[in-house]
Amino acid sequence: MARITLRQLLDHAAERSYGVPAFNINNMEQGLAIMEAARASDAPVILQVSRGARSYANDVMLAKMMEALEEMYPDIPLCIHQDHGNNVATCLTAIQHGFTSVMMDGSLKEDAKTPADYDYNVSITAEVSRLAHMVGASVEGELGCLGSLETGHGEAEDGHGFEGALDRSQLLTDPDEAARFVAETGVDALAVAIGTSHGAYKFTRKPTGEVLAMDVIEKIHERLPDTHIVMHGSSSVPQEWQDVFNAHGGQMRETYGVPVEEIVRGIRFGVRKVNIDTDLRLAAAAAFRRVADTSRSEFDPRKFLKPAMDAMSAVCKARFEAFGTAGNASRIKVVPMPEMARRYASGSLKPQSARSEAA
């Protein structure tokens, strides 16, 4: 099985009405944990890499690691995705290193801190789409800024996130504007703002429609029934792993993530890609703490890393099952990037027209 583009994978997910978790990766242990879970679940995989991860691990190391994972798990369709690209160069160098998909986040300017206006977002996202599609790579865009509807603030992740406070209109994607954006940029997937944010501290209470606007997804799907919607900041921050973390010396304050059942609801309304990072970090860190606390003489890193990998795999398997991803890897016949490039050039992959409100 070869590497798969995000567009082909999400097209398949739409045809079969499932969602695909996109797990952030920094190192070998995360990669092995995710791929083992995928093999056990017969699930296709999206491994995504932030700019911070590229800086931490180095592009050469990441590229070789992805090659190794592809070779070790030949039956798993593997999409390699740049998360939150901040400029054209970030996206193109990712493709240069073997990524099959990139996100151009034009909701913020190049500093990844300053909210951008609509015209800037359209201009830079359309340029990345034009260039990426020439070589068959997929593009995800973002409209609206990720941040909390409770506080108006965002949470920076690897240096990416707006500073200060925004009003509610800036923190929610407008469905009509979304229809224009997809038509003007040609993106393959659209990340929307609905009140989720990066990191562990998303909500101070179990989220309701007041702070997690799932109705926005339904309205966008109604306007854009053929567009693949992406939910960012969608870790569920499992209570059981919070408890393990704190039971063994951690100091995580009370917090709530995005409930799995709400994500499943989103999948019914066009959500095809679900970004998850904190859940794997938390599971791994909790497993580390448990070993350090219960085996205080232990100093072999493998004795810490193996339980951490098992913990991450368990989270991945649960998400593959809940989102309906399980059982679909073996159903996919990968289309090579040169063929995807030909299809883009022919216009056959052009976004479908939005459904009008009157329709």
Swiss-Prot record:
Residues engaged in binding dihydroxyacetone phosphate: G199, G233, S234, S235, N275, I276, D277, T278
Active site positions, chain numbering: D83
Top-rank EC class of the record's enzyme: lyase
Source domain of life: Bacteria
Molecular function, one GO term: fructose-bisphosphate aldolase activity
Involved pathway(s): Carbohydrate biosynthesis; Calvin cycle; Carbohydrate degradation; glycolysis; D-glyceraldehyde 3-phosphate and glycerone phosphate from D-glucose: step 4/4
Keyword Heme belongs to the record: no
Organism of provenance: Rhizobium meliloti (strain 1021) (Ensifer meliloti)
EC number, as in UniProt: 4.1.2.13
Taxon lineage: Bacteria, Pseudomonadati, Pseudomonadota, Alphaproteobacteria, Hyphomicrobiales
Binding site for D-glyceraldehyde 3-phosphate: S50
Catalytic activity: beta-D-fructose 1,6-bisphosphate = D-glyceraldehyde 3-phosphate + dihydroxyacetone phosphate
Protein name: Fructose-bisphosphate aldolase
Binding-site positions, Zn(2+) 1: H84, H198, H232
Family: Belongs to the class II fructose-bisphosphate aldolase family.
Alphabetically ordered keywords of this record: Calvin cycle, Glycolysis, Lyase, Metal-binding, Plasmid, Zinc
Subunit record text: Homodimer.
One of the GO BP terms on file: glycolytic process
